[in-house]
From Swiss-Prot:
Its EC number is 5.4.99.25. Responsible for synthesis of pseudouridine from uracil-55 in the psi GC loop of transfer RNAs. One of its GO terms (molecular function) is tRNA pseudouridine(55) synthase activity. Belongs to the pseudouridine synthase TruB family. Type 1 subfamily. It comes from Tropheryma whipplei (strain Twist) (Whipple's bacillus). This is tRNA pseudouridine synthase B. The active site is at D53.
């Protein structure tokens, strides 16, 4: 367990950085991953966007403290995955977690080729109508679809419009096809696997899923950060001994990057050619997670243009008042003052802007800065 001092230091670190890019491991829910961060930092207010199924792994974005208000801006971003679709078996959940309800005869499977799979993918490409998986979190008459499905009630789900782009990664072997999928928010990759199997007449389910990116946020950023820490560790301790590090962070040698994962290109992901990229960062006596940190400004400026505002304007925005800016934009921008993200603002009319989401109370920031200045004299 972390001591009070370590937990306090961790709380300050996370509260200041606010946004986490987390590599969720398979076997835990997204909620469990959030709970681990809560336990590690002592911060109660943590949220996430883009829920991953327990069997899935990869990028999960979390917001700490006031940064939970930013989640709405990240939830609707396009997502990119690598996936393995197993043809010939259909399951209740459309992934490997469910019970097998259909197995295709071998003669039917023998007719499947990469070309026929490509034709199926074409039918499932572009803007399409998709019926979500029965085992999903969609609400039907106030009930979660997966709760109804577990009771033996097949929920009637409406088709929704999604955008999908496929890229094949290798040959069709052992009834499996490896793909990279870029899709709009709300797309169920499990449903894509189900529909591909249905189109080919042999059934199919999703047997592997890893999320590589959410909009401009990428999984490889975590690996790059860990590589930097590995280099720092080597400089400090040539023998590789991590004891005595003073930054409350040590790197585990126990889990190397797995180059056998389908679709993983080490060069593309910025991982060293030797493939010794360390995947896990251990906080002293704490739980093990892989992540990197961003400030609220660093995160949101990847989505919206940052605009510097005056101290008076920042005060007004913090109080919910409109401000005047001599800029022309049809969409939201980030209002920034003294390198702090104050608010996300929307245009009301020519030159007039309103605060949509307020992140920082600029008056408190100025008060804290004044206290720091007086304390240093």
């Amino acid at each position: 367990m972390l001591g009070k001092v370590e937990r306090s230091e961790m709380y300050i670190l996370f509260a200041m950085t606010q946004v986490l890019l987390v590599d969720k491991i398979s076997g835990i829910t997204s909620h469990t991953a959030v709970a681990k961060i809560r336990h590690l930092t002592g911060i109660k207010k943590i949220g996430h966007c883009g829920t991953l199924d327990p069997a899935a792994c990869g990028l999960l974005i979390m917001g700490c403290g006031t940064a939970t208000r930013l989640i709405r801006y990240m939830s609707n971003l396009d997502k990119r995955y690598i996936a393995t679709i197993t043809l010939g078996t259909q399951t209740t959940t459309d992934d490997s977690e469910g019970e097998i309800i259909y197995s295709a005869p071998k003669p039917s499977l023998d007719k499947i080729t990469l070309e026929s799979i490509g034709r199926a993918a074409e039918k499932l490409s572009g803007t399409i109508k998709q019926i979500p998986s029965a085992y999903s979190a969609i609400k039907v008459s106030g009930n979660r679809a997966y709760n109804l499905a577990r009771q033996g009630i097949i929920p009637k789900l409406n088709a929704r419009e999604v955008r999908v782009h496929w890229k094949f990664l290798g040959d069709f072997e052992n009834n499996q096809v490896h793909v990279q999928i870029t899709c709009s928010s709300g797309t169920y990759v499990r449903a894509l696997a189900r529909d591909m199997g249905k189109f080919l007449g042999v059934g199919g389910h999703l047997s592997y899923l890893k999320r590589l990116s959410i909009g401009p946020f990428h999984l490889h950023e975590i690996y790059r950060e860990i590589n930097k820490k590995e280099a720092t560790m080597s400089e400090r301790t040539p023998s590789g001994n991590t004891q005595g590090l003073t930054d409350n962070m040590a790197i585990s040698e126990s889990d190397k990057h797995d180059c056998t994962e389908p679709g993983i290109n080490c060069t593309e992901l910025g991982i060293k050619d030797t493939c010794t990229a360390l995947r896990e960062v251990h906080y002293t006596q704490g739980d093990t997670l892989s992540f990197t940190r961003l400030t609220a400004l660093q995160a949101l400026s990847r989505i919206y243009k940052p605009i510097e505002v005056s101290q008076k304007q920042a005060d007004d925005l913090s109080c919910g008042r409109y401000i005047s800016l001599g800029i022309d934009s049809k969409g939201p921008v980030c209002a920034v003052c003294k390198e702090n993200l104050i608010a996300v603002i929307q245009p009301v009319s020519a030159g007039l802007w309103r605060p949509e989401t307020v992140l920082s109370d600029n008056r408190k920031l100025n008060s804290n800065a004044a206290q720091d200045a007086s304390g240093s004299t």
